[in-house]
């Protein structure tokens, strides 16, 4: 793994190229339906990403939407107050990929072949 990638991901704790580690992660995800990788990013990367977000928040795209928690149309088979039909409002602000600086730790992570290969192995995507 490149030194730059090692500045973003805790590669000693998470050896993404190791097939045993990948298999363990896939098994954990399959069993628990979730995979938690505590301290996956270095504190330096987290601080950098947070600062970039703050510096670039003026570039964010903001959206608000009404929907149920399942993100599906209402279902007449359930009462109006059932979670399937209860409407919530969500709002979000997203900084789009083209607004992320080229030198960003986030871009390093997203564009790293070793990270994509790890995700494909764990998610069983070819």
Segments (PLM) and residue ranges:
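N-terminal auxiliary "cap/dimerization" subdomain that precedes the catalytic jelly-roll/cupin core
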Residues: 1-81
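Signature of the catalytic double-stranded beta-helix
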Residues: 41, 48-58, 74-126
């Amino acid at each position: 793994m490149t030194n730059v990638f090692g500045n973003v991901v805790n590669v000693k704790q998470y050896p993404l190229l190791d097939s045993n580690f990948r298999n363990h992660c896939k098994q954990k995800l399959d069993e628990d339906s979730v995979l938690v990788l505590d301290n996956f990013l270095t504190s330096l990367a987290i601080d950098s990403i947070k600062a970039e977000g703050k510096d670039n928040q003026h570039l964010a795209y903001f959206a608000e939407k009404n929907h149920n928690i399942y993100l599906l149309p209402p279902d007449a088979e359930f009462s109006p107050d059932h979670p399937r039909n209860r409407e919530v409002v969500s709002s979000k602000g997203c900084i789009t990929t083209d607004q992320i600086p080229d030198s960003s730790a986030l871009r390093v992570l997203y564009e790293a072949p070793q990270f994509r290969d790890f995700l494909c192995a764990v998610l069983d995507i070819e």
